[in-house]
């Protein structure tokens, strides 16, 4: 007999979410996650994928994955520290380090795992973490797991960061201090003020930790936000995902050799999870090689991002202050935002609404993710649909 307490909890809370319009219905794709997707037999222009460079369906990555399966099989067969480390994993990590301009790197099974692994391997209850208020959920969870004191500073407010860092240091309560920030903030597309953060960190001896999930492949000619600012030798932890611009799955931490050596013996996701599959490792490595060989996809992504931004702005939409191809269309009211997204969907544009509590109340938006794989014709069609629905609903 199943638990009555659990049944009551689930029924009440699921009903509460549904009554508030916050229950997320998942739409399964019947196609690859490219610029055009198929859901329920209908085709849509896809503006919701983080497959920034279109590499998730690139034939070169497919060939690399298939070749690895033929040589190594479909699974690594063990955790990395027993005998699940393939020469492929070592080559991938060497490639990541070269890509990120660091001494070494370590690969994990997901980007989320990286933040669960790296923060708690270095920080503990005797330490403090200064964290931007808009940092990703995985940073928040990784920080909590470490049991360190979490000190939240106002979003990209360098004076607030400085004052809180000084107070933490002068308190004498903490052995180590770390400042953590996203490189690119995914909801608005703005970029962290890394030069100022590094300056404060050097002044007060803070460890620096940058999660560049949305910056790798996008900024710094593809190498990421840290490289964009020329700070590769100034940031202690460079965190990245292999599932967005890279187009596959997994994550990594890049930094000094002794940091990576420590993570290999102390980060729990590395120690207690089976290694990346051979296919994923091979595809990730090929993807990074492509980015290091040419900026063609990177340049096309930015061209498409500018094109979509200009089109929506000229129509009168509020697209915020994004500094990257991420293009939020800020509607405001939660219900209106969800209805706007629904109408776009009906018109053949798949652009999901993002509302409270993911973003602040009254700042509901439809987040658009143009990619290198979109054609101008696709973007023109999407802009036309935005105009039609926006005027119909009195938004523009």
Curated annotation (Swiss-Prot):
Pfam families: Aminotran_1_2. GO terms for molecular function: pyridoxal phosphate binding; transferase activity. Its cofactor is pyridoxal 5'-phosphate. It comes from the Bacteria. Pyridoxal 5'-phosphate binds at residues 111-112, 186, 211-214, 241-244. Keywords: Pyridoxal phosphate, Transferase. This is Putative pyridoxal phosphate-dependent acyltransferase.
